[in-house]
Regions:
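Nuclease catalytic cores that cleave nucleic-acid phosphodiester bonds
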Residues: 3-8, 12-173
């Protein structure tokens, strides 16, 4: 089975997604990034994806770092490197017969470039919809689980006999 990898243009997503857009436009990039990463984490866990979210250094000059947050690999590019450049290079490296690489961006030039390299393209709106559907599915599943009354399973006959023996021994004490 192929390893599924989703490369995300982080600031592109935060600028387009309904929930993160207001934070992005007010310059509250930390809040926008946190919301995006939390949503991507839930989506990735449910879908069995590895997510690498790339942010341009233009908004955080001199940072260049890679770290894990919410089970998502977060990359801040070099100061002179765009997220597009980094994603194109990484998509080319990762696109092997063992990997299925998808790139989430609404930048049409970027979509065509990575598509030409064999990666799948996912526009921002489509990824936002996929994440929303996953959240809805998770909510339905969690609503079906009743932690107050776990489902009862009938005891098999051997376990029932063992329990009766233990109770008889206790009564003898």
């Amino acid at each position: 089975m192929k390893r599924k990898i989703l490369l995300v243009d982080g600031y592109n997503m935060t600028a387009f997604w309904r929930e993160t857009r207001p934070f992005f436009h007010r310059g509250e990039l930390d809040a926008a990034r946190t919301i995006l990463l939390q949503k991507l984490s839930n989506y990735a866990s449910f879908e069995g994806l590895e997510v690498i979210c790339v942010f341009d250094a233009q908004y955080m000059p001199g940072v260049r770092q890679t770290y894990e947050e919410f089970n998502v690999t977060v990359v801040f590019t070099e100061e002179e490197e765009t997220a597009d450049d980094y994603i194109e290079r990484l998509a080319a490296e990762l696109n092997t017969p063992k990997n299925q690489v998808s790139v989430a961006t609404s930048d049409l030039n970027e979509q065509w470039t990575v598509f030409a390299q064999g990666a799948l393209r996912v526009p921002a709106r489509e990824l936002e919809k996929r994440v929303a559907v996953t959240k809805s599915d998770l909510n339905k599943l969690s609503g079906q689980i009743n932690l107050q009354r776990p489902p009862l399973r009938p005891m098999d006959s051997q376990s029932l006999r063992d329990l009766q023996k233990m109770m008889e021994k206790k009564d003898d004490l």
